[in-house]
């Protein structure tokens, strides 16, 4: 072989090596990035060529796909968008996915390994591939009642969240976040309309894309007194334990004072029982109770209820609830009434109520009842799982009695005839100027008190006037409407 031919052969070999190296880099090392690149139309065309599975609740369709004549073969449809957006999320050409559309994507698009047999059968038979289905724990009647109550609970729409749980299992019966949005606007194949909708939602100061039920934490206010009371009871306090009834009290190690709602004393005498202080939600009494219980016991009890612990996915990701740092006696006093750095998601506060309702046992919350193949054959079912025992049955029973008494002195708008409810309200200051910022209104409850079927947490953000925007006035009627729907569903 002469020199020229050798040079040509070497050049060809070098080119082949370079081509193989480039193919290796592209197919092995860069494959994931290329697949995830939103500019990769082949991936999108492949995904939209398959009929994505359904998301359902109690037989009701929450999300499904319909055939189109366009370049992208299937279009995602959400028939009741606003009420269920926090559950389904969206599936979008330009903005990826959220909610169950994201968490259960492998099942919905058919790529889950448990659907391999179906994919193989489709390949040999020539059937069009289809995704699997997700059946949620949501009860449509409960979800709709909670959504409707939020839309009409504040002389118009409220901003906030409602979560309802089945105490004995941890099933999420309702998960509402308001204001909400229409996922159909982000699922459209009209990319210009999709981008316009995204920009409006992203820039909306009301944050409709935020799932307030699980992605945001809030000061719980007086609803946290349930945990403070649990810690005190476990440490030896009793419902008859006497506490101060003073209208205001100085916070130790500080120049600040803390007062009861409206600046009123808790009772006619110098002291008041824990039972009466709980029912009237007396701040000064609970500062004393928290200080006498101590930081370690309060934080340990909060952790037993699920705070300061990474929460399990439901399968959506949930923000961690926390007591925050309690660095001194003043911080302990404020934390004991659910202020300072204490912050909970509405889901976590619903779990607090559900744990008491379940004799002190905390159940792992979950949103997916079962996963099914395209032929509706079940591929997995969620089994209820105990997370921990938070309090003894005796402490849970005492807390139930205290919460029943508290419900009886709460404003009774929306009361359910013949149903005994155990509850605790809360009015939580927040923001950089809490004295001049409308407080959040809370309500946590379960019913029937002696045979609980449902536990709820209601949060109304920035409820209004400081003296009228209380948990009892705003949040409680929403909670009772949700409870009533759950009890009708179960009857």
Curated annotation (Swiss-Prot):
Q: What biological-process GO terms show up in the record? A: cell wall organization; peptidoglycan biosynthetic process; regulation of cell shape
Q: What is its EC number?
A: 3.4.16.4
- List the Gene Ontology MF annotations in alphabetical order: penicillin binding; peptidoglycan L,D-transpeptidase activity; serine-type D-Ala-D-Ala carboxypeptidase activity
Q: Please list every transmembrane segment annotated in the UniProt record, as residue ranges.
A: 9-29
Q: Which GO terms describe its cellular component?
A: plasma membrane
UniProt region (Transpeptidase), positions on chain: 160-484
Query: What highest taxon heads this organism's lineage?
Result: Bacteria
Family statement: Belongs to the transpeptidase family.
Q: List the PANTHER family.
A: PENICILLIN-BINDING PROTEIN 4B, PEPTIDOGLYCAN D,D-TRANSPEPTIDASE
Question: What name has this protein been given in UniProt?
Answer: Peptidoglycan D,D-transpeptidase PbpA
The taxonomy runs: Bacteria, Bacillati, Actinomycetota, Actinomycetes, Mycobacteriales
Q: Source gene?
A: pbpA
């Amino acid at each position: 072989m002469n020199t020229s031919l050798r040079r040509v052969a070497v050049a060809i070999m070098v080119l082949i090596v370079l081509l193989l190296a480039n193919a290796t880099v592209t197919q092995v090392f860069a494959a994931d990035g290329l697949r995830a690149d939103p500019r990769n139309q082949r991936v999108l065309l492949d995904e939209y060529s398959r009929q994505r599975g359904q998301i359902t609740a109690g037989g009701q369709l929450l999300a499904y796909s319909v055939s189109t004549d366009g370049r992208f073969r299937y279009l995602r449809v959400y028939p009741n968008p606003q009420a269920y957006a926090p559950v389904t999320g969206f599936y979008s050409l330009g903005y990826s996915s959220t909610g169950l559309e994201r968490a259960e994507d492998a099942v919905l698009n058919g790529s889950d390994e448990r659907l391999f047999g179906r994919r193989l059968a489709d390949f040999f038979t020539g059937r069009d591939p289809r995704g699997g289905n997700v059946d949620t724990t949501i009860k449509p009647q409960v979800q709709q009642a909670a959504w409707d109550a939020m839309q009409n609970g504040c002389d118009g729409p409220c901003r906030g969240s409602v979560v309802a749980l089945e105490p004995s299992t941890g099933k999420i019966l309702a998960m509402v976040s308001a204001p909400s949005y229409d996922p159909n606007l982000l699922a459209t194949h009209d990319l210009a309309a999709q981008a316009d909708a995204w920009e409006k939602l992203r820039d909306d100061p009301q944050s409709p894309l935020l799932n307030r039920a699980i992605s945001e934490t809030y000061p719980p206010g007086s609803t946290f007194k349930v945990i403070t009371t649990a810690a005190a009871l476990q440490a030896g306090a009793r419902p008859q334990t006497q506490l101060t009834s003073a209208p205001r009290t100085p916070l130790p190690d500080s120049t600040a004072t803390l007062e009861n709602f409206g600046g009123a004393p808790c009772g006619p005498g110098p002291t008041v029982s824990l039972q009466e202080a709980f029912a009237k939600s007396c701040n000064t009494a609970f500062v004393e109770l928290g200080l006498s219980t101590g930081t370690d016991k309060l934080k340990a009890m909060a952790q037993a209820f699920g705070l300061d612990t990474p929460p399990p996915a439901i399968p959506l990701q949930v923000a961690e609830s926390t007591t925050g740092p309690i660095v001194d006696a003043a911080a302990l006093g404020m934390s004991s009434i659910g202020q300072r750095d204490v912050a909970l998601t509405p889901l976590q506060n619903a779990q607090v109520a559900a744990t008491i309702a379940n004799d002190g046992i905390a159940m792992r919350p979950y949103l997916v009842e079962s996963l099914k193949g395209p032929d509706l054959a079940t591929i997995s079912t969620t089994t209820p799982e105990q997370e921990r025992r938070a309090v003894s049955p005796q402490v849970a029973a005492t807390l139930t009695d205290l919460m029943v008494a508290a419900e009886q002195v709460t404003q009774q708008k929306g009361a359910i005839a013949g149903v005994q409810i155990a509850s605790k309200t809360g009015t939580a200051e927040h923001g950089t100027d809490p004295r001049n910022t409308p407080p959040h209104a809370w309500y946590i409850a379960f019913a029937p008190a002696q045979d609980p079927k449902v536990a709820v947490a209601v949060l109304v953000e920035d409820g209004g006037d400081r003296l009228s925007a209380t948990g009892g006035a705003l949040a409680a009627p929403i909670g009772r409407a949700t409870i009533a729907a759950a009890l009708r569903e179960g009857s």
